[in-house]
Every structure is written in C-alpha cells, then in structure tokens.
Amino acid sequence: MSIAEDITQLIGRTPLVRLRRVTDGAVADIVAKLEFFNPANSVKDRIGVAMLQAAEQAGLIKPDTIILEPTSGNTGIALAMVCAARGYRCVLTMPETMSLERRMLLRAYGAELILTPGADGMSGAIAKAEELAKTDQRYFVPQQFENPANPAIHRVTTAEEVWRDTDGKVDIVVAGVGTGGTITGVAQVIKERKPSARFVAVEPAASPVLSGGQKGPHPIQGIGAGFVPPVLDQDLVDEIITVGNEDALNVARRLAREEGLLVGISSGAATVAALQVARRPENAGKLIVVVLPDFGERYLSTPLFADVAD
C-alpha cells in the first residue's frame, strides 16, 4: 500500500512544466518548478518539516514546546501545518502588510498570530519573536534565516528533483531570495555536478539589498526581507536581477491567464528574471529552471488580483 503516515510525508517531489505562452522573445527553454504542489502550497513546506525534524532529532523539542517563528507568511503556514500534524503549539510573528489570506490560513491551522508594524518589515517580526522568546523557556525558535536545516533540505530534495527531472541538462536556475535557502541548497549540489550551471538570484528593485542598495517597502511578499540572510551563500550566486513591482504583478497575472498557473507575486518576479535571462542571445538553446514558490489563491485580496475583485 502507498499510504502516507501523516501530511508531512507528502512534501516535495514537485513537478516541472514548460512555459509556452509568456515566453515571447525567449531563445532559451524555461521550465517552472511548481512548489504550490506541496501540501500547504509553497516551497516553505520543505523547511517547515526539516527544521522541526532536525530539532526533534537534536532533542531541542519536547511535547510542551511552543514553536515560535517570525515569518512573511509561507514559512509560518508550513510550520503551522507541521505543528498541527505533530501536536505542537505554534506562535508566529508577521508584518501586518502580509495578505489577509495568509493570516486566515495561519489561524485555520491553529496557529497564534502576532502582527508587527509593516514599516518595520521582517526585521520587526524577528525582533518581536526574539523579545517573546525571552519570556518563556518553552519557546523554540527555528530561525529560518540562519538554520542549517534550511539549505540542507533543498540539497537532499529540491536539488535532486531538478537534476533528475531535467536529466542533468539544467543550465540556469532562477530563484527569488527570501531566506536564500532554496538557491543555496540547490546550487551546492548542482554546481558540484555541473560547474557550468549558473544561478540567478531575484530581489525587488524597491529593496535591492543583495545588490548593495537600501531596503524599502514592496509588495513582492516572500522575497526581499531587507537584509542579507545568513543562510544565503552569495559565492554560489552568479547574478542578481532586480525586478520592479509592476513587472512582477503583471507577469504573475499573465502566468494565470496564459499558462493556467495561478501563482503568487514572487513567482511573477522570478519569471520576469527568467524571461530576461532567456532572451539573451548567449543563452540560445539552454534550459532554464525557474522556481515558482507558492499558490496565487493566498493573494486574492492583494493588488495582484485587484482587477478581478467584485
């Protein structure tokens, strides 16, 4: 029988699909890795289970432990799902600028949510979590931005999936940077096997911290945290592309209407960057894998779908 023992065993093994109708001007092939096929509909499901499993194995979590994490949404949703399946209490801090759907999903999974000022960005959510952690020794903070289990799970799952599903023919990987775990873990594996492979990081033009600019507010939820995350190995990144807010929103809408892919704003940003790379003459005939981190349904209340609101 092929029966999962709990929902966490269904995380990973997400598919690749070729983009065909939004690729005007591209001379390279673009295939999208659809991370919304994970049970809680985002790439963060991978680290949600990985960080808690690592903590369990290290004896850092007990039955009365309270999982506490600052999140822009998707990691919190993943942790809330895993905590529900494992029986842990979950408390999350999140900037108030994150979508209404994110808040409702977190609470639907049974998590307790503490909102922090939007102007403070992820730094504010992190500071609040650190403050709370000092008040009760039962709190355990996975610390996604610096937890080695984050890139590790991408080494053993995401990277292997990309390599296997492209028969090792992947030439370029494009991924947005939130924690940096995805691009770091995948690059660590694929660059070792194929040194010619290139990795492109994507960040908001309105908060180009990785590019050496100043942090700023932006609507591309899930990337552009406003600081360089410790998990990110910048030596593995060959290029950083900044994407404008409207470009990200417009391409995310196009993915829904022209490819049938209902995805979030950061997926639009990653695809903008992938298209830019795919249009370069030197990349003719190459295979580009772009990571689409999450599902569009959790953005229905945001500017992404304002044009279809009643």
Curated annotation (Swiss-Prot):
Competitively inhibited by a four-residue peptide derived from the C-terminus of serine acetyltransferase (CysE). This suggests that CysK1 may associate with CysE in vivo to form a bi-enzyme complex, in which the OASS activity is down-regulated. It catalyses: O-acetyl-L-serine + hydrogen sulfide = L-cysteine + acetate. SUPFAM superfamilies: Tryptophan synthase beta subunit-like PLP-dependent enzymes. The gene is cysK1. Pyridoxal 5'-phosphate binds at residues 74, 178-182, 266. One of its GO terms (cellular component) is cytosol. The lineage of its organism: Bacteria, Bacillati, Actinomycetota, Actinomycetes, Mycobacteriales. Its cofactor is pyridoxal 5'-phosphate. InterPro entries: Cys_synth (IPR005856), Cys_Synth/Cystath_Beta-Synth (IPR050214), CysK (IPR005859), P-phosphate_BS (IPR001216), TrpB-like_PALP (IPR001926), TrpB-like_PALP_sf (IPR036052). Homodimer. Belongs to the cysteine synthase/cystathionine beta-synthase family. This is O-acetylserine sulfhydrylase. It comes from Mycobacterium tuberculosis (strain ATCC 25618 / H37Rv).
